[in-house]
């Protein structure tokens, strides 16, 4: 088992989550919500831990299927643990278990919630809840395939572990390019749906 390569992947996952946590912080700033500072704090922690973990690239970055499975499971656990921290730090969820359930529900696109009225949350938290569903729709590890330099076999094993079904199809010969195409389509569909909702009279938020 290549644990150093798995640790390297997890460090990148933390950096990405730190960057993503800046979005709800910005939303909170726009709505002048003091609670949004917790999103910035957790974002900084994630980025610092991620940078420390990627300072030394492992000599062997080869990924086999078992490493892919471990990296996938550990990545989703890491995302959920750190992603739920702002929810409990803002004081909007009664317990960490509830906050963790909420974020796991988001990243897995389950849609379940422990709250009877989500509208009582601040704008930053409302955005983060919705954003986790959007992130989970494609998968963070698919995004990693576009930015982490790995061998083709390692990319495929990581993709196999992340994707449902017994096999993974590629739109183009290079898996990195496939991930890029998938995200372009995903972004495009998101923009189209936002425009349609705006035309239907819904506010941007």
Residue ranges and their predicted role:
Residues 1-205:
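Membrane-proximal intracellular helices of multi-pass ion channels
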């Amino acid at each position: 088992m290549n644990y150093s390569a798995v640790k390297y992947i997890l460090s990148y996952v933390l950096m990405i989550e730190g960057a993503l946590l800046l979005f709800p912080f910005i939303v909170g700033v726009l709505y002048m919500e003091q609670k949004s500072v917790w999103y910035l704090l957790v974002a900084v922690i994630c980025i610092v831990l991620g940078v420390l973990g990627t300072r030394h690239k492992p000599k062997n970055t080869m990924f086999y299927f078992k490493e892919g499975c471990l990296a996938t499971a550990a990545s989703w656990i890491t995302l959920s643990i750190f992603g739920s921290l702002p929810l409990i730090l803002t004081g909007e969820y009664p317990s960490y278990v509830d906050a963790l359930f909420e974020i796991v529900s988001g990243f897995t696109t389950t849609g379940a919630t422990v709250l009877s009225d989500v509208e009582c949350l601040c704008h930053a938290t409302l955005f983060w809840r919705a954003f986790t569903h959007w992130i989970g729709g494609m998968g963070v590890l698919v995004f990693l395939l576009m930015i982490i330099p790995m061998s083709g076999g390692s990319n495929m094993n990581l993709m196999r572990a992340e994707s449902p079904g017994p096999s993974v199809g590629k739109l183009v010969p290079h898996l990195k390019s496939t991930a890029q195409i998938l995200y372009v389509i995903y972004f495009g569909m998101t923009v189209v749906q936002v425009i349609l909702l705006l035309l239907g009279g819904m506010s941007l938020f």
